[in-house]
Regions:
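Active-site-proximal alpha-helical scaffold in enzymes
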Residues: 1-16, 52-67, 145-171
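Terminal domain-initiation and capping elements
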Residues: 3-6, 19-21, 30-32, 36-37, ...
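Conserved beta-ketoacyl condensing-enzyme motif
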Residues: 8-9, 16-19, 101-133, 181-183
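Acidic, glycine-rich active-site loops and adjacent beta-strand->loop/helix elements
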Residues: 15-19, 76-80, 113-114, 140-142, ...
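Short acidic, glycine/serine/threonine-rich loops at helix termini
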Residues: 21-26, 121, 194-197
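Condensing-enzyme catalytic core mediating Claisen C-C bond formation in acyl metabolism
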Residues: 28-108, 133, 181, 189-190, ...
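Conserved phosphate-binding/catalytic loops in two-lobed NTP-binding clefts
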Residues: 131-145
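Short hairpin/turn module used for nucleic-acid contact or packing/dimerization
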Residues: 156-203
């Protein structure tokens, strides 16, 4: 709508609420870990399942360059069953090329690793290959796993850009630089994948 000039300001967001029924069903399907764990131990436990989450996030998008703007969404792309990790690696390269951003210009990769050993294979592969020399961070130990958790990641990325700092609790390795371009990559149990490129405002 913004690109087609049908609106100037749009409120968008995502909501997911965890109920007792949905928790029981998803637990039976093996989406959650069988035993309670601390969220801070999510990436230490090398087994199946994640931790359940819920959340809501809303953003005011505008086509106007204003001083109070926090960040700019450069690009967004979704994929349904894109294939194996190598196929997703190619998708990421094409996505960055489309938006005239090189890998070296990506200051931070925000990943949707959720602690499920099978689910995280694609992240592990990308972390050792295309993202090998780029600082990485995780976020699902803070919000849990849910279908629209990428909205939490987008909020987190915007706050990183606004405050010029990366919280230590999300860093995979210590960072010394302030990110200007953040690439968010998330997938929901291998089915729905998304890429969001967010940057500081150029105004």
């Amino acid at each position: 709508l913004l690109n087609e000039k049908e609106a100037t300001n749009i409120l968008v967001g995502g909501i997911d609420e965890m109920t007792d029924v949905s928790f029981k069903i998803l637990s039976r399907l093996g989406l959650y870990k069988r035993k309670p764990i601390s969220n801070l131990s999510l990436y230490v436990e090398k087994n199946s399942g994640s931790i359940g989450g819920e959340g809501s996030a809303f953003f005011l998008l505008s086509d106007q360059s204003l001083q109070e703007n926090i960040a700019e969404i450069i690009g967004l792309q979704t994929y349904f069953k894109p294939g194996n990790a190598q196929a997703m690696e190619l998708n990421i390269q094409n996505f960055l090329y489309k938006h005239s951003i090189s890998l070296n210009e990506s200051d931070l990769i925000l990943l949707g690793i959720n602690g499920d050993i099978s689910n995280d294979k694609v992240y592990t592969y990308l972390g050792k290959n295309i993202f090998k020399h780029i600082p990485q961070a995780n976020y699902k130990h803070l919000c849990g796993e849910y279908p629209t958790s990428v909205s939490f990641a987008l909020w987190l990325a915007a706050m990183i850009i606004k405050n010029n700092t990366v919280p230590g609790i999300i860093q995979v390795q210590p960072m010394t630089t302030v990110p200007k371009n953040i690439l968010i990559y998330n997938h929901y149990y291998g089915l729905y994948h998304s890429l969001i490129l967010i940057s500081n405002c150029s105004n």
